[in-house]
């Protein structure tokens, strides 16, 4: 059964021809003469041998298998040019990237410059560290740290009291004018007026500060009347005590 397939296979080839077509019969074989190829070693083709079972199977064409062209020469195709220039690659690219010495880096000028720049940068950072400028908002804020109280001079307090008696609520424009006149910030003026209104409410036992000047004047008038009434009452009591004595 096996001889039938072998005989049918050998009828397609003449005596002396190989089972495989010749390498030069391919269409692109003619163009290989101008292309460089890579050689892996001078003895690669000579040491290559077929497996013995192939020759035993094709016993009729054992003589033809021994005439394969790749066994006669180390290279099946004639090599032209340096093997290192295959497809434009230089032989330098076959060097190892790791463990390269400075002598090898001379051929790679850009690589040498890059490595030298990295070393210089590290040396500069170690030798002369750049001083960082710290701004007030960059400083860490402690949990228990409080902002210091603003102290006002007598002149500033007097002017603020006058402004408060004239108008307890300042507009944005007036607050800017007062802050520039007294050398304070808008925030400081705003906080002072807030504290002053709270103080007034405590002194007058009021839950709400008067929203208008007329209402404030009415409250002040009532306060004066109470003081006068209490003064007359205390004066009458003093007179009664003097009479009794």
Swiss-Prot record:
Example of a GO MF term: RNA polymerase II transcription regulatory region sequence-specific DNA binding
Keyword Nucleus tagged: yes
Protein name: Homeobox protein Hox-B8a
Annotated family: Belongs to the Antp homeobox family.
Region (Disordered) residue spans: 202-245
GO CC annotations on file: nucleus
Compositionally biased spans, kind Basic and acidic residues: 202-228
Primary residence: nucleus
Stored SUPFAM superfamilies: Homeodomain-like
Subcellular localization, as worded in the UniProt entry: Nucleus
Top-rank taxon, per record: Eukaryota
Motif mapping: Antp-type hexapeptide: 134-139
Keyword Transcription included in the entry's annotation: yes
Protein function: Sequence-specific transcription factor which is part of a developmental regulatory system that provides cells with specific positional identities on the anterior-posterior axis.
PANTHER family per the UniProt record, alphabetical: HOMEOBOX DOMAIN-CONTAINING PROTEIN, HOMEOBOX PROTEIN HOX-B8
GO biological process annotation, one example: cell population proliferation
Signal peptide residues on this chain, from the entry's feature table: none
DNA-binding segment(s): 145-204
Gene3D superfamilies assigned: Homeodomain-like
UniProt keyword list: Developmental protein, DNA-binding, Homeobox, Nucleus, Transcription, Transcription regulation
């Amino acid at each position: 059964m096996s001889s039938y397939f072998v005989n049918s296979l050998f009828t397609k080839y003449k005596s002396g021809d190989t089972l495989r077509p010749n390498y030069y019969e391919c269409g692109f074989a003619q163009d290989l003469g101008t292309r460089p190829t890579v050689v892996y070693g001078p003895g690669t083709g000579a040491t290559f041998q077929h497996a013995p079972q192939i020759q035993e199977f094709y016993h009729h064409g054992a003589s033809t298998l021994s005439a394969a062209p790749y066994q006669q020469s180390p290279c099946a195709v004639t090599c032209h040019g340096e093997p290192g220039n295959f497809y434009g690659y230089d032989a330098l690219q076959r060097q190892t990237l790791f463990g390269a010495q400075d002598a090898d880096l001379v051929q790679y000028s850009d690589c040498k410059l890059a490595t030298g720049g990295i070393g210089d940068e590290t040396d500069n950072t170690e030798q002369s560290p750049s001083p960082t400028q710290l701004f007030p908002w960059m400083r860490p804020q402690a949990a228990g740290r409080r902002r210091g109280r603003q102290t006002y001079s007598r002149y500033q307090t007097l002017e603020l009291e006058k402004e408060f008696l004239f108008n307890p609520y300042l507009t944005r424009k007036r607050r800017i004018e007062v802050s520039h006149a007294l050398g304070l910030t808008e925030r400081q003026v705003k906080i002072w007026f807030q504290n002053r209104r709270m103080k007034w409410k405590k002194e007058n036992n009021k839950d709400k500060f008067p929203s208008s000047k007329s209402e404030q004047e009415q409250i002040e008038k009532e306060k004066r009347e109470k003081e006068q009434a209490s003064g007359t009452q205390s004066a009458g009591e003093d007179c009664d005590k003097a009479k009794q004595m």
